[in-house]
């Protein structure tokens, strides 16, 4: 597994779906070029949390995580997980999974407790559903695996379309 070194700054007026797709695509292409893996299939992805038309950041500090959680408290938001598969012949296939998540109203103590656990670090929207944040979620509509970061249904379909022997 490799990390792509790309600029992940959203472009001016770029909508969340377009941003997620662009990130997955650019990561796949960057990994192919940087690591000279043209002869291999490259699967890349990105998970984006959006509130309205706003793309929330990946929380790199407590203040950002706290801001994201306060914004999401008691609200619905979308988690967009885009994947891109680049084949050795240069074909690029893409899929996007969209999941709606609603947090329960969060108290300051709940936010503080979640922040103290550190699961938020590097996570889109400042939370990781596969950890204790699951207890903060009132409901989810869509793909749980997409919120974790790899939409399994879409990944399977993408690999099958590329000719992988999947039954």
Task: Name each model feature, range by range.
Residues 1-9:
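A short beta-strand-loop structural module common to alpha/beta enzyme folds
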Residues 12-167:
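Anionic-ligand binding patches
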């Amino acid at each position: 597994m490799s990390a792509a070194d790309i600029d992940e700054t959203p472009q001016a007026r770029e909508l969340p779906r377009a941003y997620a797709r662009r990130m997955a695509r650019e990561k796949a292409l960057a990994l192919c070029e940087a690591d000279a893996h043209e002869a291999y299939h490259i699967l890349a992805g990105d998970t984006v949390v959006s509130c309205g038309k706003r793309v929330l950041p990946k929380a790199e500090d407590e203040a950002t995580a706290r801001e994201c959680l306060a914004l999401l408290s008691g609200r619905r938001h979308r988690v967009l997980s885009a994947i891109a598969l680049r084949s050795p012949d240069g074909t690029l296939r893409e899929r996007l999974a969209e999941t709606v998540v609603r947090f329960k109203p969060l108290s300051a103590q709940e936010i503080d407790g979640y922040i103290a656990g550190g699961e938020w670090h590097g996570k889109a929207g400042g939370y990781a559903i596969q950890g204790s944040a699951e207890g903060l979620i009132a409901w989810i509509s869509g793909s749980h695996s997409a919120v974790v970061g790899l939409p399994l249904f879409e990944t399977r379909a993408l690999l099958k379309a590329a000719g992988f022997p999947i039954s």
